[in-house]
Structure formats: structure tokens, C-alpha cells
Amino acid sequence: MNIFIRVLLVSSFLFSVNSKIDQLQEESKFQEALKLCEDNYNDNDVDLLWRLARAYFDIADQTSNIDIKKNNIDKALPYSKRALEIDPNSAKANHWYAVIIGQKGLLEGTKQKILNSYDVREYGLKAIKLDPKYDGTHHLMGRWHYNVADLAWYERTIASAIYATPPEGTFEEAIEYFGNAIDTNPNDLRHYLWMAKSLYKISEYEKAKSILDEASKIEVKNESDKILINQIKELYSKL
């Protein structure tokens, strides 16, 4: 068989597999998406590797159980690292490495959260530069600014001890990023919740209410959305 035809057939097959994985993910069939990733595993396929990291993240995101979250994020990390090694200029590889390393920091406590924060910012900003229209990375950077702005005094003391120049973030910048995420994808509950949380932090209560009212019109698709709806109701009760 002509080598060009062989390469074309392989590329067509991989595109078909990746499209099916994306479809399963869109339908919230995360375990099926994970299985399809594992069944077609290739240590040199950047697009499969970041999808594998995403699948583990999605499973972690469906629960409030910390042990289950940690287990799946730990599984996701080496795949996100490998994807970045293969193609440092892949927007999705940069995005998912930033997401996973950020989640790992949040789950492991204050010091690790601060240590990982610089990587989250570095790879998150690079992902936006490579693909400015992906809502997920705008959300990621919104969360980064929110988390840094929301550091308690003792966490800031730890940050100052670790770094000569601790990370700096503001709720206003978080709001801007969440706004970008909503503009790009107005159907994701996460963007509205975290924009409202940021508005709440700067006492913009009426604007926060308005954002949560918009969120209430969005279809709930999976367990993660159900968790978000409960958080939205809790925040609304404070306004």
C-alpha cells in the first residue's frame, strides 16, 4: 500500500475516534469516553492524550468526594504532561495541563496551591494566546484570578515565604475572564456561577443576581451541573 494512502487512512481513523470521544463527552458519557481513550491509547498522540486527561477530569468533576477527585486528577496528570511534551504549542495540551495542575494544587492544600499557581497562569495564558476563542481557558484564568484574590492573610504569608514576588490577581480581572467565557459559550453554568461569585466579592449584588437569573435558564446536563445548581441556589440566598 502506498505510504501516503496508509498515513491518510490512519489519520482518518484517529479523527473518527477523537470525534466519537468528543461526542461522548458532550453527551456527559464520561466513563464511555474514558474507555474509548484507553482502548485507542497511543503515547505519541497529543490529541488522544489531552482527551484522556480531560476524561479523568470530567469524572473527578462529577463528585464532591475528595478521595475520588484526587484519584482521578492523579491519573490525569501524567497524560496532560505527556501531551505537552509532545506538542508544546497545542492549545488544548497547554489548557489541560494548566487545569490538572491547578486542580491538584487545590486538592493538596495551601502550599501546593500556591506552588502550582505560577504554572497554571503560564500555561493558561499560553493556551489563550494559541486559541483565544476557547471558553474553557478563559474560565480557567478567571478562576486563577479569583483564587489568588481570595487568598487569606495566612496564605499570603506562605506565598511571600515561597516567592519573592507572590502571585497577584483581582476579582475585577476574574469577572473579565468569566465574561469572555460566557460570550464564547453561553451554555455553561460554571461561567455564570463564578462570575456571580466574583461580583459578590466586590459587593455588586444586583449584577450577581442578574447573572444567576441567566444561569437558571440553562439546561442541567449531568451530575456536575447538579452540584453547580446547588451552589447557585446557595449563593442566591445570600444576595
Describe the predicted segments one by one.
Residues 23-24, 31-32, 54-89, 96-133, ...:
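Short coil/linker segments at helix-helix boundaries
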Residues 9, 13-61:
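N-terminal leader/linker segments that initiate helical-solenoid repeat arrays
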Residues 1-10:
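Sec-dependent signal peptide recognition
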Residues 189-230:
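C-terminal/domain-terminus segments
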Residues 48-50, 93, 137, 191, ...:
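TPR alpha-solenoid repeat register
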Residues 15-17, 155-156, 187-189:
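Generic helix N-cap/helix-start motif at coil->alpha-helix transitions
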Residues 45-47, 90, 134, 188, ...:
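Residue-level recognition of tetratricopeptide repeat
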